[in-house]
Amino acid sequence: MKFGKTPDAVGRYRLSTAAEEDLIGIALFGDEHFGIAQSNRYRDQLERRFTMLADQPLLYPAVDHLREGYRRSVCGVHSIFYRIDGNDVKIIRVLKNQELEKQL
């Protein structure tokens, strides 16, 4: 999944390679620890948030103190870090909140 868009979306989102890897890790962990059905629901929740970020990219605050140009949206136990890129949003990372300092 590299691009996402809903029919009425203003913009779209793109996933970085690191974000794709983060989502694979989330899926594997979720499947093993919470079961496939719950894991799928959580991934759907993340995907809905990505779509919302594409539609309303300024909704969440900038976190320039962590990384210049980044914004952060918390979804469940994960923080979604993204940048606004023209009319699109680039999802940079999807990290557990306790991984932030190590990964950014």
State what each model feature region is.
Residues 78-104:
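Enriched for short, Lys/Arg-rich terminal
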Residues 58-88:
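Basic/aromatic recognition patch in beta-strand/loop cores that engages polyanionic ligands
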Residues 51-55:
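Short proline/glycine- and basic residue-enriched helix-capping loop/turn segments at helix->loop/beta transitions
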Residues 1-41:
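Arg/Lys-rich, positively charged N-terminal/basic patches that mediate binding to nucleic acids
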